[in-house]
Regions:
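Metal-dependent phosphoesterase core characteristic of DEDDh/y 3'-5' exonuclease domains
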Residues: 20-25, 29-63, 85-196, 202-205, ...
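Acidic catalytic cores of enzymes that act on phosphate-bearing nucleotides/polynucleotides
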Residues: 193, 204-284
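Long, charge-rich C-terminal accessory regions
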Residues: 245-420
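C-terminal amphipathic alpha-helical interaction region
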Residues: 398-400, 405-471
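Short hydrophobic beta-strand that contains or immediately precedes a catalytic carboxylate
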Residues: 7-9, 255
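Short acidic, Gly/Ser-rich segments with clustered Asp/Glu that frequently serve as metal-coordination loops
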Residues: 11-18
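N-terminal accessory regions of nucleic-acid-interacting proteins
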Residues: 1-5
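Metal-dependent phosphoesterase signature
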Residues: 61-81
Length: 472
């Protein structure tokens, strides 16, 4: 099959993919020349009665829970559509900050609905690409031919709606999923037309094997790297140096913009204090950040060889020079124990607090082959078959996950005991969300416009319908 792009965007009930939900999905398939194939998708997804959406999120999107219930697909229907119609073989799934946001929501959707959460991005020629870091590196090194916006604070911004406005691209209803998809395709065309070499190179570099070839600890070489973690004043781009491997199959890299001398002799404890400092600690006047970060090979990092800086004033564009980079690299190479201490720290870094909710436990481990077969059987079972289907899962996450799956999509199949378990979980889950939900309603109400007041009223009614015992 010929490769195609599928550009997509989500509007969600909040920012946490473990507990928040997709409310709107939009997408458009294109050929490799960015010409549309077929009609766009623009659908709502029903919000279930175990979720209190973030009022702040709905102020932006304008989508109410009631609207999703009236017009939306169920999660089961939506997951099947994604699997069978959208993320088909040889599809490149493309978004704007999708690696860190949208893709995580898709993974958790698939996990809840008994689909493999990863195959849609790698199996049978499938892959993914994130245009946000492509935009960052293009702006930093090959800005010619594109107008790059400044925000209302006078600072460079890579927000999609500002890029489209600066370049005369129609983008009404920013934060409507379909409008954002249309805008993203237009911005992609802009980069492809004005900087075709950069475009082709970064498209190719979505392959993690090519990233590994450029950035590895067996043949350490400095490389150009654009990331949201880097300084805005330097176009989010620097020259980095691979130090050591990380526990998650990536590599720890050092920002060669900064002199390593203050850091190379620090103890494990002192380095750990910097790496794991809280937000409050980082705000202290005397806090000096450690310029290291993890690069994940499978997250489409925007990287390129150092040679790209020799063309078109590249060094000047990112306010660096070869002499500084070489000097700082030499210091790192003369202190190999520094890399070893970092490796130890990252390999033994504190685990996140373990989740008790099976829906939030996606990353607690991979399923074994026997459970993968059972998961497929659940997904393919008819409603009648599911009623008496009680597979003996090896993984303890899956039995409660099956109960939730049945409760949301086939509630008439629940026994009295299963219904009691579900209602207990649902009530506990809603009560945990309630304090923040109420705080947000109260904070937003005084300054809300008429349109926003309607949304807040709908949220109040939603709360009363899913938690009728609450005195609103």
């Amino acid at each position: 099959m010929a490769q195609t792009f599928f550009f997509y965007d989500l509007e969600t009930s909040g920012l946490n993919p473990r507990q928040d939900r997709i409310m709107q999905f939009a997408g458009q398939r294109t050929d490799m020349d960015l010409q549309p194939i077929g009609e766009p998708y623009n659908i709502l997804v029903t919000l279930n009665d175990d979720t209190l959406p973030s009022p702040d999120a709905l102020m932006v999107t304008g989508i109410t829970p009631q609207k999703t219930v009236e017009e939306g697909y169920t999660e089961v229907q939506f997951a099947r559509m994604l699997s069978e119609e959208i993320f088909t073989p040889d599809t490149i799934a493309v978004g704007f900050n999708n690696i860190r946001f949208d893709d995580e929501f898709i993974r958790h959707l698939f996990w809840r609905n008994f689909y493999d959460p990863y195959e849609w991005t790698w199996k049978d020629g499938r892959s993914r690409w994130d245009l946000l870091d492509v935009v960052r590196l293009t702006r930093a090194l090959r800005p010619e031919g594109i107008e790059w916006p400044i925000d209302d604070k006078g600072e460079p911004s890579n927000r999609l709606e500002l890029i489209t406005k600066a370049n005369g691209i129609e983008h009404e209803n920013a934060h409507d999923a379909l409008a954002d998809v249309t805008a993203l395709i237009a911005v992609t065309k802009l980069i492809k037309q004005n900087q075709p070499q950069m475009y082709d190179y970064l498209l190719k570099m979505r392959d993690k094997k090519l990233v590994q070839k450029l950035v590895n600890v067996d043949d350490k070489k400095p490389f150009v790297y654009a990331s949201g973690r880097y300084d805005k004043e330097f176009a989010k781009t620097t020259v980095a140096f691979p130090l050591t491997t990380s526990r998650n199959g990536g590599v720890i890299v050092y920002d060669l913009r900064y002199d390593p001398t203050p850091f190379v002799d620090l103890s494990v404890e002192e380095l750990s204090a910097k790496i794991f400092a809280t937000w409050e600690e980082r705000q202290a006047e005397d806090f000096v950040k450690l310029p290291v970060k993890e690069l994940q090979y499978n997250r489409c990092p925007a990287v390129s060889p150092l040679g790209v800086l020799t063309q078109g004033d590249g060094w000047k564009k990112i306010s660096l020079d070869a002499e500084t980079v070489q000097k700082h690299q030499d210091i790192l190479l003369s202190h190999p124990d520094f890399a070893e201490r970092l490796r130890s720290i990252f390999e033994n870094k504190p685990e996140f607090k373990k989740m008790t909710d099976p829906e939030a436990q996606l990353y607690d481990g991979f399923l074994d082959n026997s459970d993968r077969v059972r998961v497929e059987a659940v997904r393919n079972a008819s409603e009648r078959e599911l009623a008496d289907f009680h597979p003996e899962f090896q993984d303890e996450r899956l039995s409660p996950l099956l109960l939730h799956y049945k409760a949301r999509s086939f509630p008439n199949l629940l026994s009295e005991d299963e219904l009691r378990q579900w209602e207990e979980w649902r009530n506990e889950h809603l009560q945990a969300q309630l304090p923040q939900f109420m705080k947000s309603l109260q904070r937003l109400a005084p300054s809300a416009t008429d349109e926003q007041q309607f949304i807040l009223q709908e949220l109040q009614l939603w709360l009363e319908s899913v938690l009728p015992s609450v005195d609103a």
